[in-house]
Amino acid sequence: MAPYHRISVRVQATLSRHMNGHPAQILRRLIAVLLLVCAAVAAASAQDASPRWRALVVDTFNSRLGSPDDISTVVARASATHVNLLYVQVRRRGDAFYLDGSEPLPEGVAIEGGFDPLGDLIAKARAAGLEVHALLTLGPVWHLSTAPADPRHVFTRHGFQNGRAVEGAENWLTRTLQPDGNGTSMEGYRFGNDYWLDFGHPAAAAYVVDLVTRLVQRYPVDGVHLDALHYPEAPAGSASIGYNAVAVARYQARTGAPGLPGQDDGRWSEWRREQITALTRRLTVSALAVRPALVVSVSGVATGAAPGDPRGTVAYARTFQDWFRWAADGSVDVVVPQVYRAEHLPATADEFSAWMAWLQGAPRVRPLVIALGAYLNSLEGLLRQSRTALAASGDNGGLALFSLAANNAPVVTNPLSSPAGRDTPQRPFEDVASALRTGRTTSGQLVDQAQAAGIFASTVPRPPTPWKDTAGYVLGTVEDGSGAPVDGAQVRLDAAGVPAGPADIVTDGSGVFATPAVTPGTYRLQVVSPAGGAYTSDCTVDVSARGVARLTLVVEASRAGVASCR
């Protein structure tokens, strides 16, 4: 069967779903889908030897990193697939697979005494030509019914103690206002199995910034991957999340709104998105201030239907993660949308196609590395999705496979098998690696009858990051005359009397602001306080390529209209 014929079977369903609406909208959607089909066919018919992002996710719930032999196994397996980088989960739930003084080693995981998993992995991966990007799962911090054994654990200090929620400002957890029993428990603090930090709490936000910065200072990783940098999905399709007492008090002080905001209140929703965007930029710029060549990437929520408008997505409207903006304004180096769908199920296969069509045309100035749920798919489905994702990600994009350990699934009556409808078993890793390289299992069986070649037939480097040579950043703090942080101040960069920076830079609960990537040059800063007072900095700041300019601005009534620089 020719590749275009096989692809067209699924495209028919995608087209039929988009054929309702205004004729101009129909035409645009039709063109997007057809372009994706053409790109996928072209990618399927020739081996792409150009630089691409090829990543494997090493999830440490399923991959062992407790000994030198474990590390050697991970590196050998990754090398066998012809990927060029690893997203290695070194923080799962408030723990550390590296030697860190603030967070404990993971519980219930065998790690040899004194052994440094991350340090050993960096050395061995680099020798094998693989980059190591430290994946830190930031939001969820605990998942068991029993308390952490180590008293240093952030959940013990700032979550629950002796079965009761920590009271007052020392409680950093987010919560829902919905009653328990609908996917939540423990007074609305537990979502499924997990407890999450509330990044509307200034101390929680500062904690993860310190965590990431400290790791970058101590380990020569090639990148940091910010995972679960959003609010958790509240149950039953709601937006009832973010109701940490300190966060709500900040919102009330900022807006003057009395009482608890409603879950669908527009200002409350925008405030929650603002917290995640501000933290994302602060994490990015703080890490790049330590090592400018570092690649900072972020996981993008891609559950639910593909966007007609990103504002209708689960990411934007329910987890308050506007990764669409970050890809378009340079808030991070790489966005990794997690499009985890099963290819053998018609409903999820259609969702996958719709997401790929949208991602191919999505506005962006940074690469998209599309993450696929290998654990959900047969090997046939994984290869099909990989080709489509590579086409959708564009010339400077790529894909990430989740995960190294959970790399394929058995499927009963698999419509993608040859002949169709056979039960396909879970293949051993050796078959997965062989199929990625050659299109065949170790026994020589062709996996995808429509395409004989492997998708990773040869090794390639990951793409360069040229924007790093043409962009810089500003990291600053706004204080009042007493030295207290100013929460919610708007900051603009003004070049030669013309506002030059984005209009959405806002100080967080610590008074800190960080810009997305800006053009090198000399800037004066404009500050608008939450009360509406307008101030212009009495100094200029020089932003250089690959540089992070730092300053503190002081706004006070005694100097009307002037923000003093320190």
Task: Enumerate the predicted regions with their spans.
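Active-site-adjacent "subsite" loops/lids of carbohydrate-active enzymes
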Residues: 51-54, 63-64, 134, 139-214, ...
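Catalytic domains of carbohydrate-active enzymes, especially glycoside hydrolases
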Residues: 70-95, 219, 332-334
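Glycoside hydrolase catalytic-domain groove-lining segments
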Residues: 250-310, 315-378
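Substrate-binding cleft of secreted/luminal carbohydrate-active enzymes
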Residues: 323-324, 331-348, 358-464
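Short, ordered, surface-exposed loop/turn motifs in non-cytosolic proteins
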Residues: 474, 480-500, 520
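Short, acidic Ser/Thr/Gly-rich low-complexity loop/linker segments typical of extracellular
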Residues: 495-517
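A short, solvent-exposed beta-strand micro-motif common in secreted/extracellular proteins
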Residues: 521-532
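Structured interaction patches on ligand/partner-binding surfaces of diverse proteins
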Residues: 530-558
